[in-house]
Amino acid sequence: MTTKRKPYVRPMTSTWWKKLPFYRFYMLREGTAVPAVWFSIELIFGLFALKNGPEAWAGFVDFLQNPVIVIINLITLAAALLHTKTWFELAPKAANIIVKDEKMGPEPIIKSLWAVTVVATIVILFVALYW
């Protein structure tokens, strides 16, 4: 059976997501993928420069010292930290941990994830700088 009645389609502008802070923050969080792509491409170019010898590596290091690239990399770091923060806040919602017949709150899980991140960062920096 078919009908000739047209369903009502509510008009929606292309900027509908700008009206609510939740959606604006959601778009910002999802936008952190763009700086991640930048960093991935930069890392791949660094690996190729490392493979191609000292001259190529020196050129890559000069590229990284450009003030514009430093600013872009700082923006990338901020985006990565924002993404990490929101991801760590979502993790406790996926884990249902029960201790003594009570559901564990999100704070210990979030703090544990940040502690692991800090320890891993310190270990990686130590290995990179002193090994």
Curated annotation (Swiss-Prot):
Keywords: Cell inner membrane, Cell membrane, Membrane, Transmembrane, Transmembrane helix. Coiled coil: none annotated. The chain crosses the membrane at residues 22-49, 66-90, 105-128. This is Fumarate reductase subunit C. A menaquinone binds at residues 29-30, 87. Residues 50-65, 129-131 are periplasmic. It is a multi-pass membrane protein. Part of an enzyme complex containing four subunits: a flavoprotein (FrdA), an iron-sulfur protein (FrdB), and two hydrophobic anchor proteins (FrdC and FrdD).
